Amino acid sequence: MKKNKTWLRGFAAGIGVSVAVGGTLFYVQYGTLPLIGDSVVTGKTASKAARIERLIEKNYLEEVESESMAEGMYAGMLASLGDPYSGYFSEENYKKLMESTEGKYTGIGLSMQQDTETKEITVYECFEGSPAEQAGVKEGDVIYTVGDRMASEMEVSEISDWIKSGEMEELKLVLLRDGEEITVTIVPETVELPVVRSRMLPEELGYLQIEEFTEGTPEQFKKAYEELKKQKAQGLIIDLRNNPGGLLTSVCDTLEQILPEGMIVYTEDRYGNREEHTCEGKTPIEIPLVVLVNEESASAAEIFAGAVKDHQVGTLVGTTTFGKGIVQKTYPLGDGSAVKMTVSKYYTPNGVNIHGEGISPDVEVKWPEDKDKPVRISDMNELPVQEWLEQDNQMKKSVEVLSGLVAEKEK
């Protein structure tokens, strides 16, 4: 019987839930927002809202907190836009959003997964150099107790929020490993979430996966890319499958390291105002490049793929991307909360807006219909190469394409 499991890398972060950053975000300082056209908040609407509030207070079956109603009202204004990418963030959720995009968290540096039936929690991944790794935690360890509580009686999000709260100077865990109890004490600290993974493949081919475009992605990419070049990589595969996007600044700073001089991406708002993001072209890539994409490659990942394709510096392999060609801006409201809304469209260097369409690969390779798709690409790219290629037909084709490009260049 297949067991149902949920996983949360936020244990490292101490965040309560995973916050998907499916769109590029800008962060702006709080200021006065001009009113354009007729205001929704008038004496008439305020009076109606007050009347509804009184009816709820008097007649609703259960007691309702006024703060909860207010939060729902704010959220409703954004929900009325009918835009899945626009929304209201309470103070708590805005903090989580910011932490997610920054890629840095207060935590101990590991991911965990919980069996939804037995509630057993195991260590899924222990980040290199993290407090957890230094304390001796290993992947596969069963978390038996957290402090003085049984881990199986807690939810992953509860543990995560507890770490994030900063209420503890150190965290005591009892682990089960091969039937033996192991006690470790860990001091939470700022942990940078690893979002770039790399390795060398046979035939001097380099592989680099980008899971998400956070603030830390450009520097992590730089280190990994430089290391692959030191190992004499003659070609490079950049894997963007299942990458939901992230920060516009992050993807631009990453592309700056491989593109020639020219346009990376530009945006236009409803008034026709255009903002361009360009590359100086100081370090254009000089080896053959393959970019691996799928239907879950979205937003900033599509900016990356679109720029590579339009500049003709690489070959796209996989399936058509998600098709998110719009940009959101986040406005802090001064009290810790914020609103995020769609403010512009983005265009690839050749002037293409891919919203609702996606980017088609140069070489299409669909995942087998009779085979489950991996939740995380890193579940496969840490396998021995031969086993990996046997399980991953898209990666296998990428290696074939890249090998051909390298051979062609060497002629």
Which residues fall in each region the model found?
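Short, structured beta-strand/loop micro-motifs enriched in basic residues and often containing a Trp
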Residues: 120-127, 382
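Hydrophobic beta-strand signal
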Residues: 144-145, 340
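Structural motif
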Residues: 140-142, 337
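Conserved P-loop NTPase
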Residues: 328-333, 339-374
